[in-house]
């Protein structure tokens, strides 16, 4: 298999898989302290064998806008995901933002 389709978009299957682990809402100092105290052995192994970095959050500091910024490289004003929920005007209900069609730009993938 050389390609895969996700949410209606085609992607090349990576030659070398990449895994991104996001500690949402976690101050990097918590991780540093846990590593120093030796209570995060799996994170320590990941750090030793891969890449570890901290990212600046976008505003608003909700999960979906930040994850969208990670995969697009642009702020919420560009990609269009400004929260975890939106008000569906047709039904008057709050809906969780999970539909890839709501993205206004491509990804870095």
List the predicted regions and their residue ranges.
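Active-site nucleophile/metal-coordination loop of metallo-enzymes that catalyze phosphate/sulfate
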Residues: 1-17, 25-109
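Generic enzyme active-site microenvironment
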Residues: 22
